[in-house]
């Protein structure tokens, strides 16, 4: 599966090299492509503004979310949010992840056709809400999905279109703002309740309420609310898309589903996966990483340049929008042999040709000071869900498909208009 925008950037890189300027002066674009370009971007984090780059995400994530935070505000907020998403915390959520995907699989019947992408969106949204914030938000998972959708629809349009919608107060803008108000009211009430009557399963909510930054300050209720919304939104929007692509690959690359199912059966012996089992699922981990390589959620990413920079003898003027690309980096043959082939075994440390990529060579979660704080959560959830799928079900793509599957949405790559599969077998949960 190839994405036209990504392919155009890849062709541009091969033709012009790592730096391409478009537009005039400080108001144009600079394309900085390839692994060394990524290293440069991550090493110069203080030269870019996230708030100016991602202002179009404010209606969804809120004005204090990490993705629109710069400098001291970003460091302070991240120092409170990040500890709750470290590996040892995420391991405690594996049982919740298993329970949520099992509930979805329990509803499947042999011969049934369904959009696996939509099924996974619902499962991941509830799993993320329950894992991080307990039942107090998990019970509202469907409501949150309904209210977030008009906001996500805004972000799938160019920023210029969103600004126009805001300026003219279009019906779509009004629907989105009304939805955000309903989300805010719900989460504000849950924050207030958690302060007065905390629960054992509040998990991340407890971290956000009681955590202190390195300077000893706590988050405001607005910052807590924006953190909750952005964690749920980013978690299910990107992870469900990546999972759909993983299933697409497993169903279209000969032998991959069988290899994954065989490994899960051998390692788990019919048990549900526990946190300690995941590292032993070498092939399945390869499926996850290979999916994130070929189908990175973000085809491109951008940074607004705050001060003049020099890269490889070329000046990058302040004010320009710098664009770099995981899609390009992940398809360079000098880094990835046979780059367009889906090869889970390239991630096996025991393979003769194994090569661990450098941080600037594999960037599905970006890198540097602004690397996605949910990376461990996402890869863990993908591994758990795929392990249950190959253990309990057999899927296939319909022999007669009514539409061609395409890649859509450069910010959270997803199959469009969905991924219809047929259930061949669905076994009861062990």
UniProtKB/Swiss-Prot annotation:
This is Putative cytochrome P450 139. Its cofactor is heme. Belongs to the cytochrome P450 family. Its EC number is 1.14.-.-. GO terms for molecular function: heme binding; iron ion binding; monooxygenase activity; oxidoreductase activity; oxidoreductase activity, acting on paired donors, with incorporation or reduction of molecular oxygen. GO terms for cellular component: peptidoglycan-based cell wall. It holds the Pfam family p450. Heme binds at residue 372. The gene is cyp139. The keyword Chloroplast does not apply.
């Amino acid at each position: 599966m190839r994405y036209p925008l990504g392919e155009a950037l890849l062709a541009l890189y091969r033709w012009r090299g790592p730096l391409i300027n478009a537009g005039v002066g400080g108001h144009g674009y600079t394309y900085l492509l390839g692994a060394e370009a990524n290293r440069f971007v991550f090493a110069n984090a203080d030269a870019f503004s996230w708030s100016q780059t991602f202002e179009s995400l404010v209606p969804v994530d809120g004005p204090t979310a990490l993705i629109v935070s710069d400098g001291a505000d970003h460091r302070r907020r991240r120092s409170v949010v990040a500890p709750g998403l470290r590996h040892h915390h995420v391991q405690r959520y594996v049982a919740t992840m298993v329970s949520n995907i099992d509930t979805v699989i329990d509803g499947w019947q042999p011969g049934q056709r369904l959009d696996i992408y939509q099924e996974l969106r619902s499962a991941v949204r509830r799993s993320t809400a329950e894992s991080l914030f307990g039942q107090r938000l998990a019970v509202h998972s469907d409501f949150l999905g309904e209210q977030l959708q008009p906001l996500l629809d805004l972000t799938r349009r160019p920023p210029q279109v969103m600004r126009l919608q805001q300026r003219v107060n279009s019906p779509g803008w009004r629907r989105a703002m009304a939805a955000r108000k309903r989300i805010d009211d719900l989460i504000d009430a849950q924050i207030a309740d958690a302060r007065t009557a905390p629960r054992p399963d509040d998990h991340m909510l407890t971290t956000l309420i009681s955590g202190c930054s390195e300077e000893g300050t706590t988050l405001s209720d607005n910052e807590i609310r924006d953190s909750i919304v952005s964690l749920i939104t980013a978690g299910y929007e990107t992870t469900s898309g990546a999972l759909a692509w993983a299933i697409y690959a497993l169903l279209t690359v000969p032998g991959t589903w069988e290899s994954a199912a065989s490994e899960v059966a051998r390692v788990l012996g019919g048990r549900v996966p526990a946190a300690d089992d995941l590292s032993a699922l070498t092939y399945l981990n390869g499926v996850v990483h290979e999916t994130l390589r070929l189908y990175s959620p973000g085809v491109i990413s951008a940074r607004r340049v705050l001060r003049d920079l020099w890269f490889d003898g070329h000046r990058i003027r302040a004010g320009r929008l710098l664009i770099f690309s995981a899609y390009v980096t992940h398809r360079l043959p000098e880094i990835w042999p046979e780059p367009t082939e889906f090869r889970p075994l390239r991630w096996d440390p025991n393979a003769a040709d194994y090569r661990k990529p450098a941080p600037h060579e594999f960037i599905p979660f970006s890198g540097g000071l602004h690397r996605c704080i949910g990376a461990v959560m996402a890869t863990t959830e993908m591994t758990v869900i795929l392990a249950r799928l190959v253990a309990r079900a057999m899927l296939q793509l319909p022999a007669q498909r009514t539409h061609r599957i395409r890649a859509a949405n450069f910010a959270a790559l997803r199959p469009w208009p969905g991924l219809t599969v047929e259930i061949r077998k669905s076994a009861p949960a062990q």
